[in-house]
């Protein structure tokens, strides 16, 4: 659903509507990420011991994100909103390359490719929605566009199959992790900002 009909002038969507859409979208992205990870795991990672290697090597690890709801509760909502923006921006580049590289895989499974394309598209929509939310919650605040730079493209293009598959596995593992965090942060922010923490 487009937030404003095309050509609409001064279209104002309520903050509650924006949050509703953002929460639905982030939940959808997390579901797709989980499905894509599970599909990849089943098809390519069996018996390769990837999980034990994939600990704490996400490109967004440099952004200190709260690990659970209790930690997130301690963070001021302005900082949490900015953190969500940073994590979403940090995924623009890797998602673009993920789609390109999956397309180039031999017998690229449609179950993985179609989800990668959809996630890239929806991540952009969620980022736009979050920028609108920040604009309403803190009008006039110029948010600096800080994000974590991803440098994993060479590993997705390695000639060695094991190394390449592990790079894909790790990226999908991180995507699932981060999409889960964003989903939780947005639910928490919606509760705080829209319902004054009465939920």
Curated annotation (Swiss-Prot):
Prolactin acts primarily on the mammary gland by promoting lactation. It is found in: Secreted. The gene is PRL. GO terms for cellular component: extracellular space. One of its GO terms (molecular function) is prolactin receptor binding. This is Prolactin. The modification Phosphoserine is found at residues 26, 34, 90. It comes from Camelus dromedarius. Disulfide bonds join 4-11, 58-174, 191-199. Interacts with PRLR. The keyword Phosphoprotein applies. Glycans are attached at residue 31. InterPro entries: 4_helix_cytokine-like_core (IPR009079), Somatotropin/Prolactin (IPR001400), Somatotropin_CS (IPR018116). It holds the Pfam family Hormone_1. SUPFAM superfamilies: 4-helical cytokines (SSF47266). One of its GO terms (biological process) is female pregnancy. It comes from the Eukaryota. Keywords: Disulfide bond, Glycoprotein, Hormone, Lactation, Phosphoprotein, Secreted. Gene3D superfamilies: 1.20.1250.10.
């Amino acid at each position: 659903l487009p937030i404003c009909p095309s050509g609409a002038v001064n279209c104002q969507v309520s903050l509650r509507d924006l949050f509703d859409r953002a929460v639905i979208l982030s939940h959808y992205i997390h579901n797709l990420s989980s499905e894509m990870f599970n599909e990849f795991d089943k098809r390519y990672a069996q018996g390769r011991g990837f999980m034990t290697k994939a600990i704490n090597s996400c490109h967004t690890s440099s952004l200190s994100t709260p690990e659970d709801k209790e930690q997130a509760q301690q963070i001021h909502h302005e900082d949490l909103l900015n953190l969500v923006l940073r994590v979403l921006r940090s995924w623009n580049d890797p998602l673009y390359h993920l789609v390109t590289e999956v397309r180039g895989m031999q017998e690229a499974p449609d179950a993985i490719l179609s989800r990668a394309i959809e996630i890239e598209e929806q991540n952009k929509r969620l980022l736009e929605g979050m920028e609108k939310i920040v604009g309403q919650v803190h009008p006039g605040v110029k948010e600096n566009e800080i994000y974590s730079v991803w440098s994993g493209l060479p590993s997705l293009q390695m000639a060695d199959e094991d190394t390449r598959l592990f790079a894909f596995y790790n990226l999908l593992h991180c995507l699932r992790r981060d999409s889960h965090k964003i989903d939780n942060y947005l639910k928490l922010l919606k509760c705080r900002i829209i319902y004054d923490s009465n939920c």
